[in-house]
From Swiss-Prot:
<dbReference type="Pfam" id="PF08240">
    <property type="entry name" value="ADH_N"/>
</dbReference>
<keyword id="KW-0444">Lipid biosynthesis</keyword>
<keyword id="KW-0496">Mitochondrion</keyword>
<keyword id="KW-0443">Lipid metabolism</keyword>
<feature type="binding site">
    <location>
        <position position="172"/>
    </location>
    <ligand>
        <name>NADP(+)</name>
    </ligand>
</feature>
<keyword id="KW-0521">NADP</keyword>
<feature type="binding site">
    <location>
        <position position="381"/>
    </location>
    <ligand>
        <name>NADP(+)</name>
    </ligand>
</feature>
<dbReference type="InterPro" id="IPR051034">
    <property type="entry name" value="Mito_Enoyl-ACP_Reductase"/>
</dbReference>
<dbReference type="InterPro" id="IPR011032">
    <property type="entry name" value="GroES-like_sf"/>
</dbReference>
<comment type="similarity">
    <text>Belongs to the zinc-containing alcohol dehydrogenase family. Quinone oxidoreductase subfamily.</text>
</comment>
<comment type="function">
    <text>Required for respiration and the maintenance of the mitochondrial compartment. Oxidoreductase with a preference for short and medium chain substrates, including trans-2-hexenoyl-CoA (C6), trans-2-decenoyl-CoA (C10), and trans-2-hexadecenoyl-CoA (C16). May play a role in mitochondrial fatty acid synthesis.</text>
</comment>
<protein>
    <recommendedName>
        <fullName>Enoyl-[acyl-carrier-protein] reductase 2, mitochondrial</fullName>
        <ecNumber>1.3.1.104</ecNumber>
    </recommendedName>
</protein>
<feature type="binding site">
    <location>
        <begin position="296"/>
        <end position="299"/>
    </location>
    <ligand>
        <name>NADP(+)</name>
    </ligand>
</feature>
<dbReference type="InterPro" id="IPR020843">
    <property type="entry name" value="PKS_ER"/>
</dbReference>
<feature type="transit peptide" description="Mitochondrion">
    <location>
        <begin position="1"/>
        <end position="22"/>
    </location>
</feature>
<dbReference type="GO" id="GO:0141148">
    <property type="term" value="F:enoyl-[acyl-carrier-protein] reductase (NADPH) activity"/>
</dbReference>
<feature type="binding site">
    <location>
        <begin position="199"/>
        <end position="202"/>
    </location>
    <ligand>
        <name>NADP(+)</name>
    </ligand>
</feature>
Amino acid sequence: MYSVLKQSIRPRLLATHNQFRTMITAQAVLYTQHGEPKDVLFTQSFEIDDDNLAPNEVIVKTLGSPINPSDINQIQGVYPSKPAKTTGFGTAEPAAPCGNEGLFEVIKVGSNVSSLEAGDWVIPSHVNFGTWRTHALGNDDDFIKLPNPAQSKANGKPNGLTINQGATISVNPLTAYLMLTHYVKLTPGKDWFIQNGGTSAVGKYASQIGKLLNFNSISVIRDRPNLDEVVASLKELGATQVITEDQNNSKEFGPTIKEWIKQSGGEAKLALNCVGGKSSTGIARKLNNNGLMLTYGGMSFQPVTIPTSLYIFKNFTSAGFWVTELLKNNKELKTSTLNQIIAWYEEGKLTDAKSIETLYDGTKPLHELYQDGVANSKDGKQLITY
């Protein structure tokens, strides 16, 4: 897989052997050295010859690309998966592209490409594609097709994907779905999963998907002044029960949870941990025998500590979950999971986690827009649209 960035400003005509060919000016956000995004990012311009595509090549323009914590960690050099550095963008020294998630629209395909055509929406099929850019050039197998709104409408679907849904589809919703379905068989209508980080994007997707699959769920959240309002909103999304971290860690509240599970006739078989520390200990204790806890984050920056007794007497299992590793060599699993998420979006059964959208209009350098987004990430997920 390879990629080249570009930005659609205006095709430029070049005379070559008495013929004219068009070049598309392109831009991308790169870095040559790891560090803080505010210090190391820059915008690189270059051109793509769109009149001389190889048979399997595809040119796409960006519709939107979000800023994820993993993107920031890659730039800092602390994320296990990193994009390769290259001089293919026209830089004097090797540079790496930023961004892992993004939604693109096909604008031109090579003569051998039959799976895609102009106007199709696509996302990268591989990790480390580099999505903080205006356009990209790749092979047809570098992309997975998503239905654009017109195609959804033509297929009789009540809803088409939004740019936010398409641009953010490959991390959080897939993480939630795969954790709920890929490791433990939960009996619909009976069994339970418990998760901390209930107000996080993955937590909200897990609550919704759990309800769609008829799984019972307990979401653990931090206490807050508007607790009743937040609890009501999470239950409306699909959480069966919502408790606070204090209740999660309270021995006195334990019998209440056991009674919920008993009344359903099932078991608590799965825990989803993105916090760590005593929160992870609390949700692990709620599981029945042979339970599994998947850790996919560590927002508290505290280690996961599990009592030895859970391993010995309850045959407890603790494992990590990293969607990138699971899907990097399994395009079929990624595609089938995407198809399920897309179907729920089209049917209006799944609500996406909203992003704070900023339009790139060329008034400031592209990398500054992403630097602003990184700085504003504390206010919510940032999505740069084009």
